């Protein structure tokens, strides 16, 4: 992944939150992200597809669910930026984390 593409991907509020939530939680399914971000499934999927295209995420199908996590092959400096931002942005993510920690009614 190129540096410019990385920062462009992070420039969108939804994609930034997805990356930060995955950094904090390890892996999440689409319904978890839909619940946390309060956006429709097609919008979540569109943002996830963009992040996959930029090689920031990998996915794994388990039964009927697809789980997403940060790409372990991502350069260390990129992972460090996402991780540091996540750990220092609890106010930015507070509502998302609160909804994520409640039961996911969409699953």
Segments the model singles out, each with a brief description of its role:
Residues 2, 24, 76-107:
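Amphipathic alpha-helical dimerization/coiled-coil segments
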Residues 8-14, 72-73:
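Short helix-coil-helix linker/hinge
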Residues 13, 25-29:
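Short capping segments at the starts of secondary-structure elements
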Residues 16-20:
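Pre-recognition alpha-helix immediately N-terminal to the DNA-recognition helix
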Residues 33-34:
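A short acidic, leucine-rich amphipathic alpha-helix
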Residues 40-43:
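Helix-turn-helix DNA-binding motif, specifically the short coil turn and the N-cap/start of the second
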Residues 53-62, 69:
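Beta-hairpin "wing" of winged helix-turn-helix
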């Amino acid at each position: 992944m190129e540096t410019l593409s990385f920062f462009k991907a992070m420039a969108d509020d939804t994609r930034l939150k997805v990356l930060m939530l995955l950094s904090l939680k390890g892996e999440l399914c689409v319904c978890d992200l839909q619940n946390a971000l309060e956006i429709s499934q097609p919008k979540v999927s569109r943002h996830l597809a963009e992040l996959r295209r930029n090689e920031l995420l990998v996915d794994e199908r388990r039964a009927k669910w697809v789980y997403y996590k940060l790409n372990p092959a991502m350069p260390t400096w990129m992972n460090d930026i996402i991780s540091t931002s996540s750990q220092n942005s609890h106010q930015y993510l507070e509502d998302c984390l609160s909804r994520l920690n409640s039961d996911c009614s969409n699953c």
